[in-house]
């Protein structure tokens, strides 16, 4: 899964990709081609 600062290009990479919001983060998931998975933002430090 790629960590990107912006998902603008990741949304249109593949026709089956969909944008999902989970736990305050934005994910791009693609069940037919999982290599296009991406998440926006980075891990928070404690």
UniProtKB/Swiss-Prot annotation:
Q: Which GO terms describe its molecular function?
A: structural constituent of ribosome
InterPro entries associated with the record: Ribosomal_bL36, Ribosomal_bL36_sp, Ribosomal_L36_bact
Instruction: Tell me which positions the record assigns to the signal sequence.
Output: none
Q: Which GO terms describe its cellular component?
A: ribonucleoprotein complex; ribosome
SUPFAM superfamilies from the UniProt entry = Ribosomal protein L36
Q: Looking at the record's lineage, which domain of life comes first?
A: Bacteria
Q: List GO BP terms, alphabetically.
A: translation
Ordered alphabetically, the record's keywords are: Ribonucleoprotein, Ribosomal protein
NCBIfam families on file: PRK00831.1, rpmJ_bact
Which HAMAP family does this one have?
Ribosomal_bL36
Family in the record: Belongs to the bacterial ribosomal protein bL36 family.
Protein name as it appears in the record:
Large ribosomal subunit protein bL36A
Its source organism is: Sodalis glossinidius (strain morsitans)
The uppermost taxa in this organism's lineage are: Bacteria, Pseudomonadati, Pseudomonadota, Gammaproteobacteria, Enterobacterales
Gene symbol here is rpmJ1
């Amino acid at each position: 899964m790629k960590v990107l600062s912006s998902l603008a290009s990741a949304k249109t990479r593949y026709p089956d990709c969909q944008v999902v919001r989970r736990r305050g983060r934005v994910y791009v998931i693609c069940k037919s081609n999982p290599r296009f998975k991406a998440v926006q933002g980075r891990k928070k430090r404690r």
